[in-house]
Amino acid sequence: IGKESLENATSSYNLEFRDSEYKFPTHCPECGTTLVREEGEAAWRCPNESGCAPQIKGKMEHFVSRKAMNIEGLGSETIDLLYSQGLLKNIADIYSLTQEDIARQERLGEKSAHNMLASIEVSKQVPWARVLFALGIRMVGETTARKIARRFPSIDQLQWATMEQLTSIEDVG
């Protein structure tokens, strides 16, 4: 953009019609829950993790992603479709899908259902660190998940971890 074009563009904007103050949204536009901001963080977010459709679907998308459980054939469009049909309400529902559930959906079929179920079956063998990452726990990325998994090699050991044990892990707490 040339200097003249920029000057013309900015001089034609009438500031008189601009609202004097931006009104930041206070509620989630999807579910209506009051937005919150954690101390020390800049972002406001919806805390309704189990009732806000975009959050539920986003968690599922993260869970099935390549670096997490690597479930092929279950991308955002398919998650949207299965969520809208009531077949996916949470991550656990992925492991309850049947050949019939998938095959009867528009744009899917027997072959898609077979491939998706095979990929879901393979996902049951991913390393514990990837499962931990796939859960989408705030502030637990791939590296932190690996560190936690090294310290607590099973979910049984992790569930009994004390706060002191967890915070003694580098990058945790």
Language model segments and positions:
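Charged catalytic and DNA/RNA-contacting regions of genome-maintenance
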Residues: 1
